[in-house]
């Protein structure tokens, strides 16, 4: 298995199930998982054939451009196709983070001034750290910091994005995020305190529409290059979220 996807062996069947559905439902014309002996034997016990899921991500090829040797290359191409900038020297985690932050940044741009103010006011930092950071650095940088926080903020933000990706791609959210989405948002990178009055559920509701719009717009454009992008972009985004989730859980 590709070293950058080895962490998938630590994921639950529920977590892997969403990746399976992205690969098989969005790539229904060219996926090979559902015809494999492993799938026929184990069905929804995805942990039994996680290597097959990883290989499908790497080799997914509705057009020959997408036959890649390693996940880093696939992630880099998906990142650039999403509109985010990355370099070959970036680690896989950095590439995923830049892609996810870009998605959230584009969502922020589409928010009304009212919704932006709701976000800032609920954070309790208007005139403080978050407000100043957003003005000086921009939304993409802000969410990049949250994703790289390595603590609760990264975990919670990743759950929000994963929930948005699966809702947009599969028309259903991630059930394993339900409890966390009701807890207060912790922005430890910037202030080290709990954002007063802001829950992930409220924040998710603010970003659900714009993030969905960003993904829809991106996937519409990607149709021009070939249907493989409709799979690899949400797959890489979801994998990036899973990586942050497992990293956080591993520290507890």
Each predicted region: which residue ranges?
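Membrane-engaging insertion elements
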Residues: 170-252
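Terminal export/targeting leaders at protein ends
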Residues: 1-159
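Glycine-rich anion/phosphate-binding loop at the beta-strand->alpha-helix junction
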Residues: 162
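Extended aliphatic helical segments
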Residues: 33, 50, 57, 74, ...
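Solvent-exposed flexible segments
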Residues: 124, 128, 132-152, 166, ...
